[in-house]
Amino acid sequence: GEVVGVLAEDWSMSEDGMVSTFQIKQGVKFSDGSDLTAEDVAKSILAVPVNLGQYNGSYGRLSTIIEDAVATDEYTVELHLTQPYYNTLRELCLANPFGIVSSEQFNDDLTAKQESFRSATYGTGPYMYAGDNDGQTWNFVRNPNYWGEAPEVDSFSIKYIPDNDAKILAMQNGEVDFLSGIKNVSAESYAQMEQTDGYGAQVDEKSLQTYYVGYNLSSEIFGDQVVREAISSAIDKDAVVDNIYGGLFDKADTFFSRDLPYCDVEQTVYGFD
């Protein structure tokens, strides 16, 4: 899809692909009332690999090739990379880990001020964090300093319910209004709610996730390619889709989802035999 600017009004990339320049929207405020500047954007970007630590790269390659992020003036940021990267813009669109927060929420070494992040949010979005209830329910309210059109809903809460049946019961009792994610709702529960009057159920047309089983190549058994091919041919993926996931999934014949850029490719796959 097309990249659409929100906090960035305009951007350009150098011919060698090593430097991206962003013009930051003026008049935007954080939830604490402070102004968004290029310095906040630069520091938020530089803080990503620092705070990810050993997990740096888990959310994409961009955070592993950042050389520097520089505020060249109050509303202009330059992102310098160690090498060109085709997916720079798309990865910057990921709120996790590239969400922009006030630079005041980082220590001098760019580590996050943990107590601040646990008690409040310092972003530019329409809502802000308003505390939790015993670590089970997290509450959010309208951001009074939001620069865009005010959201219709005054507040909302995210509730943690570990048991699948309890989630459905909570919805039926009116405790929750919305359940999301295949990990949060079983195929059976989805089918049940889909057929119940007064409820709606929807499956996204596109998915970026692939569920797979990987072979341990250091194993004496799975180190044999013939064994791996035999097992791959013995798995009826159509039956898995129908009987375990209620027909809600598409059969995966490639490691990456075909909905990802450049991944809709044809190749010879192992059929069920």
Which residues fall in each region the model found?
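Surface-exposed binding/hinge segments that line
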Residues: 12, 16, 23, 58-106
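A structural "hinge/loop" feature
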Residues: 7-8, 34, 88-99, 124, ...
